[in-house]
């Protein structure tokens, strides 16, 4: 059965992402995981970090990958399938690589449920739009928006992966202590890993030139930017010798 594009759920999903991003800024509190786990009640149920991240991120890969699996296989098919493939690439890494290498603290179960719901909804939104709604001109692969967007996506993913590697090296298996991250973009900002992911989704929004991707990029900027800000405050409070020239998210600016 052929699926027809319906604009109403696309608009509703995009509006929800924008609202969630704005809500994160309005509340202005860090999500209670990682460095900020203490913000939750001690009795809160927690899962090991690796299992938690795997379960939370899996829908963002499985849902769009399932949609892609129903499409004809082609390396350079319709732009929507290629762009959704980039989305799947990011979440393949987050689900099957990042989660298994994670050395973080146990993750609150309530946040896993929220994260899983978000990842499922966003995976459906991005996949549905790109496969069933998006229309691109014949020359989209040579359009500057596609080229620059894919470049930013790959650049951001590289920054994100490299920054996560630096963070993992700060802690031996079983350790829960914190150290000052050094190297890479951590030389300039406290949230280098967050900056990389924000760049990724800005690139994705540019390459797809779509409302759902733009809404997701806005949400990522709000949520991850706020988390970078709180990480920066955490480091300044914990380490007296923390580099004063280092910013939270944007080198030399913020």
Swiss-Prot record:
Coiled-coil spans in chain: none
EC number: 1.3.1.22
Outcome, altering residue 34 to R: Found in individual with micropenis; uncertain significance
Keywords: Differentiation, Disease variant, Endoplasmic reticulum, Lipid metabolism, Membrane, Microsome, NADP, Oxidoreductase, Pseudohermaphroditism, Sexual differentiation, Transmembrane, Transmembrane helix
Entry membrane topology: Multi-pass membrane protein
Catalysed reactions listed for this entry: a 3-oxo-5alpha-steroid + NADP(+) = a 3-oxo-Delta(4)-steroid + NADPH + H(+); 17beta-hydroxy-5alpha-androstan-3-one + NADP(+) = testosterone + NADPH + H(+); 5alpha-pregnane-3,20-dione + NADP(+) = progesterone + NADPH + H(+)
GO terms for biological process, alphabetical: androgen biosynthetic process; androgen metabolic process; biphenyl metabolic process; bone development; cell differentiation; cell-cell signaling; dibenzo-p-dioxin metabolic process; female genitalia development
GO CC annotations, alphabetized: cell body fiber; endoplasmic reticulum membrane; neuronal cell body
Main location: membrane
Disulfide bonds: none
Task of the protein: Converts testosterone (T) into 5-alpha-dihydrotestosterone (DHT) and progesterone or corticosterone into their corresponding 5-alpha-3-oxosteroids. It plays a central role in sexual differentiation and androgen physiology.
Family of this protein: Belongs to the steroid 5-alpha reductase family.
Protein name (record): 3-oxo-5-alpha-steroid 4-dehydrogenase 2
Organism: Homo sapiens (Human)
């Amino acid at each position: 059965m052929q699926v027809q594009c319906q604009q109403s759920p696309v608009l509703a999903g995009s509006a929800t992402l924008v609202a969630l991003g704005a809500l994160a800024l309005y509340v202005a509190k860090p999500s209670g995981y990682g460095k900020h786990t203490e913000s939750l009640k001690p009795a809160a149920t927690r899962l090991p970090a690796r299992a938690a991240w795997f379960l939370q991120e899996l829908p963002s890969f499985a849902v769009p990958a399932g949609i892609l699996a129903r499409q004809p296989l082609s390396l350079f098919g319709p732009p929507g399938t290629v762009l959704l493939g980039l989305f799947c690439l990011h979440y393949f890494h987050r689900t099957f690589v990042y989660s298994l290498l994670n050395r973080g603290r146990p993750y609150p179960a309530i946040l896993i449920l929220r994260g899983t719901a978000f990842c499922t909804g966003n995976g459906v939104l991005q996949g549905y739009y790109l496969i069933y709604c998006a229309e691109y001109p014949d020359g989209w692969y040579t359009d500057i928006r596609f080229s620059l967007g894919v470049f930013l996506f790959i650049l951001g993913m590289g920054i994100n992966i490299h920054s996560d590697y630096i963070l993992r090296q700060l802690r031996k298996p079983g350790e829960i202590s914190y150290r000052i991250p050094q190297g890479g973009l951590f030389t300039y900002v406290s949230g280098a890993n967050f900056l990389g992911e924000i760049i990724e989704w800005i690139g994705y929004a540019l390459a797809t030139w779509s409302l759902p991707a733009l809404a997701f990029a806005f949400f990522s900027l709000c949520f991850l930017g706020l988390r970078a800000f709180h990480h920066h405050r955490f480091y300044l409070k914990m380490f007296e010798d923390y580099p004063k020239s280092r910013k939270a998210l944007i080198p030399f600016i913020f």
